[in-house]
Amino acid sequence: MAADQISVRPARAADRRSLAVLFAEVAQERDGIAAEPPIDVDGLAEHWRLDGTLVAVADGDLVGEIRVDPSWMGFGEIGMMVAASWRGRGVGSALVAAAIEWARGQGLHKLALQVFPHNKAAIALYRKFGFVEEGRLAAHVRRADGQLWDLIEMGLLL
């Protein structure tokens, strides 16, 4: 499926369960997001915040999500996840483009994010949209096995 067959729209209450399942699937990979299994899908679905959340839909399935958390300081912090089977197929690009448009519409002046240094595909995607590395948080995330992982901070002035 081409990127033009992927639709991005604001998340709805009916998406909460699919979002929680996607989150659990991405967490199971143990390398893209800080959360690790087990994930309480039912509890997560019940409390999933929809404000600023955009979802990517293909063939009627939710295949990705990006959320912009606006700060009182005028910037937005973003977090994104894409189903493994949909990576490299334009979902991430569609989500980032939509988030940038949404943030501009909200009057935000900047988007910021954190990404693991080993997540080269995500870093390349963000750079494609103009995000630049602004710093590194050393040993910032403690994994369940005791490993300490760095985070790269990236930002985009809108």
Residue ranges and their predicted role:
Residues 2, 149-158:
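Terminal substrate-recognition subdomain of acyl/acetyltransferases
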Residues 7-19:
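A short beta-loop-alpha structural element at the N-terminal edge
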Residues 10-13, 24-85, 96-97, 102, ...:
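Acetyl-CoA-dependent GNAT
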Residues 18, 77, 81, 121:
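Amphipathic alpha-helical recognition patches that constitute DNA-binding helices
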Residues 88-101, 105, 124-128:
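Conserved acetyl-CoA-binding loop-helix of GNAT-fold acetyltransferases
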Residues 96, 119-122, 139-144:
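Short glycine/proline-centered loop/turn elements that form peptide/ligand docking sites
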Residues 110-115, 127, 132-148:
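Conserved catalytic-core motifs of GNAT/GCN5-like acyltransferases
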